[in-house]
Amino acid sequence: EDVGKIGDVNQGFAGLQEKHGESRVTDTGIREMSIVGQGLGAAMRGLRPLVEIQYLDYLLFALQILSDDAATLQYRSAGGQKAPLIVRTRGHRLEGIWHSGSPMGMILHSLRGMLVLVPRNMVQAAGFYNTLMHCDEPALVVECLNGYRLKEKRPDNLHEFRVVPGHAEILREGSDLTLVTYGSCCRIAMEAADLLQSMGISIEVVDAQSLLPFDVNGLCAQSLRKTSRLLILDEDVPGGASSYLLQQILEVQNGFPLLDWAPVTLTAQAHRPAYGSDGDYFSKPSVDDVVETVWGLMSRAEPGYYPP
């Protein structure tokens, strides 16, 4: 929808229809299930389609076909059929109820069998796309809506640069607490870590960047061996993707015995993002929220050093 003539709503495909023709860069009707269904059919016929859902909130209209058909194809065909479908969308932070949702828990529960990737910026997104172009797995890539106009360090080999699914990345080393997050929250975490450093608290920030699969090398557990404290920062509602991240770190990576204090989650409010230009700020975690949460955790663990 709108990827051809106008080059998508954020101009990510600008000029591609003119360059490659309407047969390769095609506008569709406004029906997400049909868009994904067309892509899935093309993928099963040997092509490598990239389909776009304008906003993450609208992916819910296509969730049934992604869950029933794309995610289960290799499983139910005993590996006999593959569909290298790439679904591109954008979400997390914007304005209003229908353009800034982060229903990642629902997606993670429904799409076992697909890759679910959540790059923190466009360079990381390009690395994932370069990898997926040579991969036979169906994948969902959720880009950051508030990341399109940021200036980033760009590798000279951007067309060859690859990011491997399943590999987390330490963005900042620290010794007092491990903060695990992804997507747009990475910038919030980094800004909060700077403030907390000035207050005498050293935060290790881990970008999961791939939720399915999640941190196959156990980087989060390695970090906990150093810090012994854990905070999950997530834009989904309470008990959404944060619950999945806790299960992966504490159970799959056996991180629970490494903790000296109960793990903490900091999530969005238990409702859809509020209306208005400031609705996102009051509905989702902010830098202030992170600083207050970390200080509260540290004051409970070491009240002598960090008074309540």
Regions inferred by a protein language model and the residue ranges of each:
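Thiamine diphosphate
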Residues: 1-142, 145-308
